[in-house]
A protein has these predicted regions:
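Hydrophobic anchor residue at the start of the ABC signature
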Residues: 125
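Helix-to-loop junction immediately C-terminal to a conserved catalytic motif
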Residues: 42
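The feature captures the beta-strand-to-loop junction immediately N-terminal to the Walker
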Residues: 27-29
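Conserved ABC ATPase signature
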Residues: 111-115, 119
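Conserved ABC ATPase "signature" region
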Residues: 89-107
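Conserved beta-strand-loop-alpha-helix hinge in the C-terminal portion
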Residues: 193-213
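Catalytic Walker B motif of ABC-type/P-loop ATPase nucleotide-binding domains
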Residues: 136-140
Length: 213
């Protein structure tokens, strides 16, 4: 559970687990606690009661990539995220590999300000990869993107979570219900609690039926 200093309870005895890699989506109304839950998982804030057990190395990706991309080029941006124990001789290969995984392999020296919104979001994903993160916390990563860029980000994340060699786990907050059809499981967040995990299509139909009432 978690409450803000003013006493407003945002997370209320929330309990859930993710047992395997994949793309898992959360949906819910504004103020239901989704983003606060991400901050708890990432360690940015601590729960007021209860515990969080996370064996993953989490990394946040936000709605607007401009808020987290700080350097002038793709290469210099990824240099910020590389763990300090990586030998200098391996830096280039690690950066290039991360860019290729998000389909930006030709963008090493590309100025970030020339990238499209979808490319910037994929660069943010590359930053998570190069940091050796294996848990992506994606807070509405396609909310500001056009349909083509939205699909490009979904495609990359789906590929990362279903890789046979080294799949990662992604938890994705969405308000775009059509995205639910891409996930391995989805749940509705309401009043600070997560409901049961179901297929994305089942959650989609449940939300559609609620909207028609």
């Amino acid at each position: 559970s978690f409450s803000w200093p003013n006493g407003v309870k945002v997370i209320n005895q929330c309990s859930f687990s993710i047992v395997k890699p994949g793309l898992w989506m959360l949906v819910g109304e504004n103020g239901s606690g989704k983003s606060t839950l991400f901050r708890l998982i990432s360690g940015a804030i601590r729960p007021k009661s209860g515990k969080i057990y996370c064996s993953f190395r989490p990394s946040m990706v936000y709605q607007n990539p401009d808020h987290q991309l700080l350097m002038p080029t793709c290469k210099s941006e990824l240099m910020l995220s590389i763990p300090k124990n990586i030998p200098h001789s391996k830096l280039f290969d690690l950066i290039q590999s991360s860019l290729e995984k998000v389909e930006l392999g030709e963008m090493l020296d590309r100025p970030i300000h020339t990238l499209s919104g979808g490319q910037k979001q994929r660069l943010a994903l590359a930053g998570a990869i190069v940091s050796n993160s294996n848990l992506l916390l994606l807070d509405e990563p396609t909310a500001l993107l056009d349909p083509q860029s939205q699909n490009s980000v979904l495609k990359v994340v789906k590929k990362l979570t279903s890789s046979s060699a080294d799949p990662i786990t992604a938890i994705w907050i969405t308000h775009r219900l059509e995205e639910l059809f891409f996930c391995d499981g989805a749940a509705i967040v309401k009043n600070g609690r997560i409901g049961e995990w179901n297929s994305g299509s089942k959650v989609f139909q449940e939300l559609k039926s609620l909207a028609l009432r």
